[in-house]
């Protein structure tokens, strides 16, 4: 009986080559099945973080312009939202928000140039285009950065504001689009939403998203300490 027990122990001791190969194959199959899920999860986390950074950039820019810590964009859109032809009622409000939101997306030259001084973070700020940089990684604003954010900003101006610059600063619409800085690394046009298609990047996606599309788009009303109710009424066709 003692001899038989020893033989049984020796017979079951260790793994055979076939068992080891089967274990390797099973582990390989499991890794192959799990790898896409891991990659998708990491991609979604990265994209969600980018959308969060872009939202913060948009909020900080709007707050900075509203408090006048950031210079207002010089890219202006003429909006005459008063129907001066209709007489019932006179000066009826004529919304032109679609015209405002149809401002063209930036066209990249493939080499984004921004100042390195913190006092003037605008890459460009003129009557045709206003681009403001948020240097997220601290290495200077560059189209090679995967973390920096570029804000395209534009504001409305009324016909009266063209005649009197001080009136234009009393209240206006501010449009903001936030793009990834690496969207400007290629000499192609960026994209934007229109009245039929929303093009902003989703927080959850099967990849890293369309880097040419805006991360965030928003429109808000800007008023200052000089803004009065009369200014808003004049711009919108009067108050009842």
Segments predicted by a language model, with ranges:
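N-terminal leader/signal peptides at the extreme start of proteins
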Residues: 1-15
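Aliphatic-rich helix starts adjacent to a transmembrane/signal segment
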Residues: 15-61
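Flexible, low-complexity segments enriched in proline/glycine/serine and punctuated by aromatic residues
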Residues: 34, 49-55, 59-240
């Amino acid at each position: 009986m003692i001899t038989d027990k020893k033989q049984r122990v020796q017979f079951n001791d260790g793994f055979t080559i076939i068992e080891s190969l089967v274990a390797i194959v099973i582990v390989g199959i499991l890794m192959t099945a799990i790898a896409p899920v891991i990659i998708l999860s990491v991609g979604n986390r990265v994209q969600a973080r980018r959308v969060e950074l872009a939202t913060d950039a948009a909020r900080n820019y709007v707050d900075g312009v509203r408090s006048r810590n950031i210079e207002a964009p010089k890219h202006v859109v003429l909006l005459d939202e008063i129907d001066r032809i209709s007489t019932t009622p006179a000066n009826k409000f004529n919304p032109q928000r679609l015209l405002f939101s149809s401002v063209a997306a930036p066209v990249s030259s493939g080499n984004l140039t921004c100042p390195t001084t913190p006092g003037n973070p605008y890459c460009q700020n003129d009557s045709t285009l206003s681009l403001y940089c948020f240097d997220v990684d601290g290495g200077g604003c560059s189209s090679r950065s995967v973390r920096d954010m570029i804000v395209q900003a534009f504001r409305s101006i009324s016909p009266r504001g063209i005649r009197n610059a001080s009136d234009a600063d009393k209240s206006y619409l501010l449009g903001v689009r936030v793009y990834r800085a690496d969207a400007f690394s290629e000499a192609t046009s960026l994209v934007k939403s229109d009245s039929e298609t929303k093009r902003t990047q989703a927080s959850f996606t099967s990849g890293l998203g369309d880097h040419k599309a805006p991360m965030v788009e928003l429109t808000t009303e800007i008023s200052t300490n000089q803004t009065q109710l009369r200014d808003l009424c004049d711009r919108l066709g009067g108050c009842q």
